[in-house]
Design a protein with these regions (language model features):
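Short, well-structured hydrophobic secondary-structure segments
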Residues: 31-67
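Charged, alpha-helix-forming regions
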Residues: 1-21, 28-36, 41, 45, ...
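Charged, amphipathic alpha-helical segments
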Residues: 5-17, 59-67, 76-79
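Mixed-charge, glycine-accented linear interaction segment located at domain edges/termini
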Residues: 101-137
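Short acidic/polar mixed-charge low-complexity motifs
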Residues: 9, 37-41, 78, 90, ...
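Intrinsic, low-complexity N-terminal interaction/targeting segments
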Residues: 22-29, 79-104
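DNA polymerase processivity clamps
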Residues: 21, 64-88, 136
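Beta-strand elements of well-folded, non-transmembrane domains
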Residues: 34-38, 49, 98-102, 116-118
Length: 137
């Protein structure tokens, strides 16, 4: 599990890697939980190991330079996404759209935005890179 927990914001990743699908762009079932100011979602994203690796590298650059952005988005389906954008003063804006893809016959969707201090990224980024860095192109 990969987790960021700050005041009024929690983001968790639960990846299931499907090595037999490495020839395809989507090979990770990424469980995602988010809670932002009391609004929450528990869903999944269909992404690839290379997409997560690139996202982790973007996050590392954002953390180290306090500039730029990092985005993880599904290549297909409803295009769920998570985005981190550097702001002034060492703050990081975290936003995204998560849709449950009509699980259980009903559509649920959350659009969220929050802000965290850069220090909350360090462990999250290091864990992602340790596990997914080898998949970077």
């Amino acid at each position: 599990m990969y987790r960021i927990e700050a005041d009024r914001f929690i983001l968790e990743f639960f990846p299931e890697i499907h090595e037999q699908d490495f020839a395809y762009p989507v090979n990770v079932y990424l469980g995602v939980k988010v809670s932002s100011y009391g609004y929450s979602a528990d869903t999944f994203m269909d992404v690839g190991v290379q997409g997560i690796a690139e996202f982790a590298l973007q996050l590392k650059n954002l953390y180290e330079t306090l500039s730029g952005e990092a985005r993880l988005e599904e290549p297909y389906s409803v295009h769920n996404y998570l985005e981190f954008v550097a702001e002034t003063g060492g703050h990081i804006r975290v936003m995204g759209r998560l849709n449950n893809k009509s699980a259980f016959g009903y559509t649920q969707e959350i659009n969220f935005e929050n802000e965290i201090d850069q220090t909350y990224l360090r462990d999250f980024v290091n864990l992602l890179l340790a596990d997914f860095g080898r998949y970077a192109e």
